[in-house]
């Protein structure tokens, strides 16, 4: 009997040592491996957009909506595919919607519909992720190009609709539009959750004066002219997308492999494998609180892994570093520069 009690006590001690306690040095909670060529210091404030890996191979130009964050730091996204920006609510969660929209085509004077075939700007315009209060990252099931927001708890949430820039019309009636898809920024609500829509919006087609409708084979979004972010100091800038930030947009900084949001909370993988922002220090039981980087492809990575999973939770997706259930899809978290515009 005494032997059994000793085994139980040993198991409890081992379990407690495997998780973070508030008094521990949380900055040492790093994965054992690092991403080859990853950047652990980035000089500019940036956001993230959820990019389903299934679409990455087919088109690097198509971006998912940026993630939002609610107050508790969680990251979430909706299931409809929209171009809505991802927001962050108060808890730090990240959330985003899932609806996809196309950019409008422009028309010139002759009535033709036209769209450009190349984007002149070096950076793609994407919507930023918002954050709610709890720091969690979440996304809605509709696919929109809306920016990801963050709510109060730090969770990250985003909708699933992808939105594209509207197409313009020139004097001859032709419709013209650019060729890159712009994603909405992820927002953050009070709890730190990250949210973003998943609907993809296509930009409207433009029309020139002759009435012809023209458009290129690639869907593009309007590039926002703005000053370039400050250059990074340890290599080529891997971030190729940018967006205008707005209230609730998840704003992140990366320094020495430590990821923080606009409120100074620590980006971490918590005990249930969810990505959210807390603290400092991170919440008890956190698995990783350091070891973040931006890959040469412009994706957020933890350790040597740049694949995350958006898993359906009610009307939103939460973001995890592991596949935890049947309603989970592999995604990349694309870094996007945030602009004041």
Swiss-Prot record:
Main location (coarse class): secreted
Cellular localization per UniProt: Secreted, Cell wall
Residue ranges the record marks as coiled coil: none
Keyword set, alphabetical order: Cell wall, Cell wall biogenesis/degradation, Cleavage on pair of basic residues, Glycoprotein, Repeat, Secreted, Signal
PIR1/2/3 repeat intervals: 64-82, 83-101, 102-125, 126-144, 145-163, 164-182, 183-201, 202-220
Induction field: Positively regulated by signaling through MPK1 in response to cell wall perturbation. Expression is also regulated by the SWI5 transcription factor.
Cellular component annotations (GO), alphabetically ordered: cellular bud scar; extracellular region; fungal-type cell wall; nuclear periphery
Pfam families reported for this sequence: PIR (PF00399), PIR1-like_C (PF22799)
Superkingdom to which the source organism belongs: Eukaryota
UniProt GO MF annotations: structural constituent of cell wall
Signal peptide: 1-18
Propeptide: 19-63
GO biological-process terms attached to the record: fungal-type cell wall organization; intracellular protein transport
Keyword Transmembrane helix set for record: no
UniProt PTM: Covalently linked to beta-1,3-glucan of the inner cell wall layer via an alkali-sensitive ester linkage between the gamma-carboxyl group of glutamic acids, arising from specific glutamines within the PIR1/2/3 repeats, and hydroxyl groups of glucoses of beta-1,3-glucan chains.
Site entry: Covalent attachment to cell wall glycan: 74, 93, 112, 136, 155, 174, 193, 212
Family of the protein in this entry: Belongs to the PIR protein family.
Other comment: Present with 1170 molecules/cell in log phase SD medium.
Free-text note regarding domains: The PIR1/2/3 repeats are required for covalent linkage to the cell wall. Their number varies among different strains of S.cerevisiae.
Function: Component of the outer cell wall layer. Required for stability of the cell wall and for optimal growth. Required for resistance against several antifungal and cell wall-perturbing agents and for tolerance to heat shock.
The protein, known as: Cell wall mannoprotein PIR1
Organism: Saccharomyces cerevisiae (strain ATCC 204508 / S288c)
Lineage: Eukaryota, Fungi, Dikarya, Ascomycota, Saccharomycotina
